[in-house]
């Protein structure tokens, strides 16, 4: 019973990145991950079987907020770096 209460995912903390054209950046990131499942309810959520991330624009600043989870810490670090490179390029 106790084991089922343990969260199996590795999470990034919320990471803010300054972006000038947020709609264009989100469109480019969605195109990059074109084989993923998408949800647009709260920003852009990109889902794969073993990892996912959400990008939300700030309501008060030119920032995108990234939250990412993965099955392993290694995968979480790899994908966090990948997504941040796309955001900040």
Residue ranges and their predicted role:
Residues 1-67, 72-89:
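Phosphate-binding and adjacent anionic-ligand microenvironments
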């Amino acid at each position: 019973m106790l084991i089922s209460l343990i969260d199996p995912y590795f999470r990034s903390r919320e990471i803010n990145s300054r972006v000038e054209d947020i709609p264009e950046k989100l469109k480019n990131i969605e195109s990059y991950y074109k084989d993923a499942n998408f949800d647009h309810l709260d920003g852009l959520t990109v889902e794969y079987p073993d990892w996912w991330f959400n990008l939300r624009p700030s309501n008060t600043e030119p920032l995108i907020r990234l939250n990412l989870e993965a099955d392993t810490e290694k995968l979480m670090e790899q994908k966090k770096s990948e997504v941040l490179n796309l955001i900040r390029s």
